[in-house]
């Protein structure tokens, strides 16, 4: 849970990864937003363009990890901390965004 991973919030979904409690990522503190900007990479460990360099990965939510507004990003972003049990399982219903029984969290 406290394993440091400076790349956990990177990618085009960087901001959702930092701000979505179900994304599998978190910041060390509320003042550390990990990301350089909305769409750029988060801290790389060098501190360039970042407030802090200690971005950490949170323990993914144990249920409903791919649901909500960021459902697609959570299911498709390898850095999101979530995964689907199979490639054909999108985890969430795109219409009402309800939880799927087969949704799983990645380790």
Curated annotation (Swiss-Prot):
Molecular function in Gene Ontology: cadmium ion binding
Keyword tRNA processing: no
Alphabetical list of InterPro entries matching this protein: Metalthion_7
Keywords: Cadmium, Metal-binding, Metal-thiolate cluster
Top-level taxonomic group: Eukaryota
Pfam family, one: Metallothio_Cad
UniProt function note: The metallothioneins are involved in the cellular sequestration of toxic metal ions. Binds 12 cadmium ions per molecule.
Family: Belongs to the metallothionein superfamily. Type 7 family.
Record-given protein name: Metallothionein-1
Organism: Tetrahymena thermophila
Upper taxonomic lineage: Eukaryota, Sar, Alveolata, Ciliophora, Intramacronucleata
């Amino acid at each position: 849970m406290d394993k440091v991973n400076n790349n956990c919030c990177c990618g085009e979904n960087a901001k959702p990864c930092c701000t979505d409690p179900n994304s599998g990522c978190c910041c060390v503190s509320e003042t550390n937003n990990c990301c350089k900007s909305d769409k750029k990479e988060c801290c790389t460990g060098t501190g360039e363009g970042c407030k802090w360099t200690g971005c950490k990965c949170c323990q993914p939510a144990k249920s409903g990890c791919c649901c909500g507004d960021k459902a697609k990003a959570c299911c498709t972003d390898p850095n999101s901390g979530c995964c689907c049990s199979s490639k054909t399982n999108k985890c969430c219903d795109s219409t009402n965004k309800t939880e799927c029984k087969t949704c799983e969290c990645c380790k």
